């Protein structure tokens, strides 16, 4: 997302576009970046419209959708049509379990509130005297990653393999809870230390862990 947006901004300034046109290009670039990364043009379009422009005008929708579709075509041409997650064939969910879906949605909503709160307050945490140097912030994140590499290695990385494994195997409630807590905190730590990165994919993993946790608890 960031690479696509920055590339679009650079192209805009190279071509001498106006500020308004540059905003449209940045939105289109971000949409193309997400669409290419996940082979998901619709997700890229909706993300850019909701997060960057917060409106659905045709002037924004058409270039954003065009860039997302074009990026997906190019990505599939070079890397194939495999998606980020490879779920097995799923059976239809019985209607008597629909309340579980609603409960998962509510739980993810509350988790999002807590995550946003933590994200906004990471500056206060990294503002402690011990983190006065930027290197200390990065060292703390690396130390946390090292601990997790020996204790919960599934938490590290993008999380694609973890989500795939959740769909194919069953884990105990305690292990899932540990994975969720570790992924939640480590995402905040790694993003807050200032190293360039994102939390879009980690949020998908957190949502999958919440669903697996409640599925293990309720079903």
Predicted regions and their residues:
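Alpha-helical transmembrane segments and immediately membrane-proximal extracytoplasmic
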Residues: 1-219
């Amino acid at each position: 997302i960031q690479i696509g947006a920055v590339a679009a901004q650079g192209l805009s300034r190279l071509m001498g576009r106006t500020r308004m046109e540059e905003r449209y290009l940045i939105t289109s670039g971000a949409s193309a970046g997400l669409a290419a990364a996940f082979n998901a043009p619709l997700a890229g379009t909706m993300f850019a419209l909701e997060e960057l422009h917060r409106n659905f005008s045709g002037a924004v929708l058409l270039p954003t959708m065009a860039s997302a579709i074009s990026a997906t075509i190019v990505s599939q041409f070079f890397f194939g049509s495999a998606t980020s997650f490879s779920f097995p064939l799923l059976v239809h969910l019985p209607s008597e379990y629909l309340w579980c879906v609603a409960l998962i949605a509510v739980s993810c909503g509350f988790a999002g509130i807590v995550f946003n709160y933590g994200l906004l307050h990471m500056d206060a945490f990294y503002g402690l005297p011990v983190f006065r140097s930027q290197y200390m912030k990065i060292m703390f994140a690396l130390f946390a990653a090292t601990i997790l590499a020996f204790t919960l290695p599934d938490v590290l990385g993008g999380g694609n393999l973890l989500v795939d494994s959740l769909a194919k195997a069953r884990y105990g409630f305690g292990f899932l809870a540990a994975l969720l807590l570790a992924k939640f905190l480590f995402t905040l730590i790694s993003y807050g230390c200032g190293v360039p990165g994102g939390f879009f994919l980690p949020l998908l993993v957190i949502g999958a862990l919440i669903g697996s946790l409640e599925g293990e608890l309720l079903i």
